[in-house]
Amino acid sequence: MCKGLAGLPASCLRSAKDMKHRLGFLLQKSDSCEHNSSHNKKDKVIICQRVSQEEVKKWAESLENLISHECGLAAFKAFLKSEYSEENIDFWISCEEYKKIKSPSKLSPKAKKIYNEFISVQASKEVNLDSCTREETSRNMLEPTITCFDEAQKKIFNLMEKDSYRRFLKSRFYLDLVNPSSCGAEKQKGAKSSADCASLVPQCA
């Protein structure tokens, strides 16, 4: 015959109370995780959709269109980083920043830094330049001007245009952006694409 809770030992009541508390905590934690997961997925889709499809399609027209757009540059750099060959785009970016220097006194130290990082024989991020261009750039270091890296930058741009840019257009780094449905799909493959897509463009927000 059931005597109700009053008939149970005190230890049983404490155990039941503890179990109820734990279940409540787990349910609350589960709800919180589901909310965060949903929120993160929404954020990733928003990031994917932040660039218009018209703009993304223009990136396939030329490398110049791609890297002149902040989000395009971020996506291309992420692709090169995945191939462990980001030194080319890093050099190109450094040259662009160098040409914006207004103070003549800052040209020489910045030029030497770029040269030592990308062009010298023992450069940590040595770019692939022919011997003539390398020697010409080396001579320019004697009296650095705003145009001292122009030839080297042009050669690296052409190299990226003929090689890595073409591979980028065939990669998921670009295809996931040009096809937004792959970013927000609920399928497992779509969810993976969403994560990858979100990692491409956060810095262009």
From Swiss-Prot:
Entry annotated with the keyword Zinc: no
Listed GO biological process terms: negative regulation of signal transduction
Gene Ontology molecular-function annotations: GTPase activity
Keywords: Lipoprotein, Palmitate, Phosphoprotein, Signal transduction inhibitor
UniProt modification remark: Palmitoylated on Cys-2 and/or Cys-12. Phosphorylated by cyclic GMP-dependent protein kinase.
Tagged with keyword Transmembrane helix: no
Stored InterPro entries: RGS (IPR016137), RGS_RGS4 (IPR034953), RGS_sf (IPR036305), RGS_subdom1/3 (IPR024066), RGS_subdomain_2 (IPR044926)
Span of domain RGS: 62-178
Pfam families linked: RGS
Residues bearing a lipid moiety (S-palmitoyl cysteine): 2, 12, 95
Classification via SMART domains: RGS
PANTHER family for this protein: REGULATOR OF G PROTEIN SIGNALING (PTHR10845), REGULATOR OF G-PROTEIN SIGNALING 4 (PTHR10845:SF184)
Function in brief: Inhibits signal transduction by increasing the GTPase activity of G protein alpha subunits thereby driving them into their inactive GDP-bound form. Activity on G(z)-alpha is inhibited by phosphorylation of the G-protein. Activity on G(z)-alpha and G(i)-alpha-1 is inhibited by palmitoylation of the G-protein.
Official protein name in the record: Regulator of G-protein signaling 4
